[in-house]
Amino acid sequence: MGRKGAKAMRFLLSLAVLAALAWSGYWALAARGIERGLAGWLDARRAEGWAADAGRISVTGFPARFDTRLAPLDLADPATGLAWSLPWFGFSAHSHRPQRVTVRWPEAQRIATPTERIEVTAEAMTGALAFRPGLALELVSAQLSVGAFGLVSDAGWRASMDGAEIETAALVDRPGAQRLRLSASGMRPPEKLVATLDPAGLLPPVFQQVAIEAVAVFDAPWDRHAVEDRRPQLRQVEIGRLDAQWGDLALQAAGRFDVDAEGQPSGSLTLRATNWREMIALARGSGRLSAPLADRLEEALGLLAGLSGRPGMLDVPLRLALGQVWLGPVPLGPAPNLRLR
């Protein structure tokens, strides 16, 4: 190698050293910024009256990643009475793409409400989040997956499922709108709820599956202010597909409804029910429908199903109005309140 070649090699080596030093400085500053930012966020929550404590905040992963861990983490919001305790909470991002974050939860967590404490077990619970660049951390998309999941309450109930996946994505052409997809399998609701819905014990204790595709429109973006200040509230929901299977009962739904400031929905849904007579029997047995009303509904719906040529399958238009769910002029029961706390 000649002198020119040696000089070129020394120059390239110097550039590599300078680049490595610059990258090391960037990583160290960014890691320190993450630690200070999290500590500042916890201080701000405490100033607002929260209980917000992280035993230790650490950032590792040099040079390619920022792997952040808070251990343990305890949060409690006095405005809602909700509290969340974890032995650790972790998230990570590539150094060159910090707005895309992978989140990890421990297998054991605890949630407390004003009335009960719930022990949570979650197998392989992970998420992937994408944020718009900026301090607001506005959510662009999210994916959450979990394996076996269980809830045990000190109020005496327990529930579980075999697994679930949730996806959301902001719609660029519709401010505040999020496309939602959810699928869950092997759901075991609390025994008391199953006994209320099915007092005769005709159905299995496990819901085989639920799948939902919908668009939800909120009055504010999902960003850090959704945790610090107020939850974005639903203003409109479009259900493209809802499929649920419980034993021999199958339910499909689609429709659209608005949500007012009090969380009351108004709009319409179309339900397709397979083995719908068993559903009426469940509503009658649980007390949701009185015997005379159940008889009238079964007679009227039987006529509709017969006209369709499929007596075991029924398409039913429902209205949501005045805080009730209606089948024509008949109120079936209260509509759910959709206000987010």
Predicted regions and their residues:
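N-terminal type II signal-anchor transmembrane helix
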Residues: G5-A39
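Extended terminal
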Residues: M9-L13, G55-S58, V227-P232, Q236, ...
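Short extracytoplasmic/periplasmic juxtamembrane "stem" segments immediately C-terminal to an N-terminal membrane anchor
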Residues: L38-R56
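N-terminal beta-strand/beta-hairpin edge segment
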Residues: W50-D173, L242
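Extended lipid/amphipathic-ligand handling interfaces
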Residues: I57-V59, L86-H96, V120-A136, S153, ...
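Flexible, membrane-facing loop/turn or short amphipathic-helix motifs
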Residues: D74-A83, Q109-V120, A148-A159, A170, ...
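Beta-strand-enriched cores of mature, soluble protein domains
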Residues: E165, L180-A184
